[in-house]
Amino acid sequence: MFKIFNDVPVPYGLYFQDSATPTFDGIIELHDIVMFYIVVTIVLVSYLLFVIIKNFSNDHISYKYLTHGTTLEIVWTIFPVVILLFIAFPSFILLYLCDEVIDPAMTIKAIASQWYWTYEYSDFIGETGEIVQFDSYIVPTDMLENGQLRMLDVDARIVVPTNTHLRFIVTSRDVIHDFALPSLGIKCDATPGRLNQVSALLQRESVYYGQCSELCGVLHSSMPIALEAVSIDKFLSWLDEQ
């Protein structure tokens, strides 16, 4: 049976794109945990407000003699602290895992410019003796082919193998940009004069889309990112063509 994955933005979408990496699995899980605590807190606070309004709306005298309540003050101090601890611990663990890059099998350097991306496969040397690199520009609307996505497809995609530890090194030639691929759980600033890194392990073959997520000028929306994850054999065949 085939399973359809949502790897692109959809109109009126209210949830995340489908996950393709363990990192994004963790982000979605943390989101669901935090949302659970938020719903519990909202329900509890709403119930308390309802009870207070109901009990004191017709009695204008009794609450005037409530000068303090030590037990109540302890409860409303400890309860938020406990909730914050339950949120903090998994978020700290996930933050560490997202930031740690251990022994990547392949490195891709993403260089942002106004308004396109340059990708360098520094681990591979082409037939000319230079590293494999290429520029990636948006496909104009009037040049789109059937099946291509407006404002998302590019003339040259990043191609990577699945089930391989990848490291993306991100930087910029001019202003601050941002390298973001939602389905991979990646969002990394591209800052001039600085190298930032982020890792990914793609678990399935597909085409993933992202965009520059930092306002970088008049054509900010014309800096899409398209990444195609393929099998090792297909990746090696693609690499031979470069």
UniProtKB/Swiss-Prot annotation:
It comes from Yarrowia lipolytica (strain CLIB 122 / E 150) (Yeast). It is an enzyme of class 7 (translocase). Its cofactor is Cu cation. Component of the cytochrome c oxidase (complex IV, CIV), a multisubunit enzyme composed of a catalytic core of 3 subunits and several supernumerary subunits. The complex exists as a monomer or a dimer and forms supercomplexes (SCs) in the inner mitochondrial membrane with ubiquinol-cytochrome c oxidoreductase (cytochrome b-c1 complex, complex III, CIII). Its EC number is 7.1.1.9. Belongs to the cytochrome c oxidase subunit 2 family. GO terms for cellular component: mitochondrial inner membrane. Residues 56-73 are mitochondrial matrix. Binds a dinuclear copper A center per subunit. The gene is COX2. The chain crosses the membrane at residues 34-55, 74-98. This is Cytochrome c oxidase subunit 2.
